[in-house]
Amino acid sequence: SYYKDYEVHGDIPYNGPGKAGAQTLDEANFLRSFALTYDLLESCMSTQEKEKIRDGLLLPGAEFLMEHRHMQLHNHEVIINSAIAIIGLIFGKEELVKEAVYEKYGLLYQLEHGMLSNHMWFEGAFGYHFYALTSFFAYEKFALHTPHSHIHHPNYKAMMELLFSYIEPGFRVPMLNDTNYGHTSSIYYLYEFAYREIGGDKLLYVLKELYKDEARDNLEAFIYGVDILPTCDIDRKS
């Protein structure tokens, strides 16, 4: 049980310590990626291997994240909660799902309180807006077809439609606050999953613009996209 014996270190203010990573944020990203990979591969594993990963890494990891959650509205908490909730779903740990999704500062709280009246994520930058949505959707992709999916919450559609009104010439995202082009280089691909599950012409418009200049051969389209994108009936110039 190597993970349990890792030293706790870091303790960055408003984020917290890590074990495998430098901070709680890194820990959550690591554990979420590992959990998703485990879910893909566990059918090929022996009972002993599955138990070792469950009891030696993923459940202790979720417990560590629970211990170091912050009671705050923040993109970090979206990432941390998504990791806890995914691990809870994998192993049928309802207490983890309940805490990470439904309790105060859980995923639903973040979704319902983190969106401003203009539909922007409260941190005021498209980088953070889509950084948060990336982790919301990491959870929703996994929770789809379970009672714990909230993909049809109206705030998801509102936040994804926001970009339609802000796209700059050259199909660029405005560099508001501390956003940079590195933050936004992959955000358009989130629209594949969102359009399939939520729909709407504004989401379709973003995808149609994206594929004017590149082939639709990315992994998000392959796994999460509709088979064929229909004709888009709206134009931002009108």
Predicted feature descriptions by range:
Residues V8-D11, E112, S117-M120, M175, ...:
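Exposed boundary/loop context
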